[in-house]
Amino acid sequence: MSYFVAPFEVSSKSLGAPLKVHFVHLYSAIATRHSDTIDVVFLVDGLKATVAVSCATLAELRGREGINLADQQLADIAALYLRQTLERGYEATEAELFLRGEQLRALGRELGYL
């Protein structure tokens, strides 16, 4: 499968120069990190940044609400979350960013997926 998130730049007063962000890949972290997440990996100025999307939240969306987000939609939601996080001045390459619950739903609604 092939997913595409267009490269983008993020600016923030606290970040200094604009940061260049590139999507790398999306994969299940259960096998690689023993984490119950779907990891969406980006490079932020060449440094790895991971947005970990909660599998429990995805299962809840599918089970209770009948919504099944496609991988491309997850990549888009993760990119928006990373963009917003960087715009607030957070250094996203220092730790994983966890995306779950209402936060994921809000971003999905913002993109028109929910």
Sequence positions of predicted segments:
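Short, charged/polar N-terminal "headpieces" of proteins
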Residues: M1-L47
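Acidic, low-complexity intrinsically disordered segments
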Residues: S2-P18, E60-L114
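A short, structured beta-strand/loop element
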Residues: I38-G63
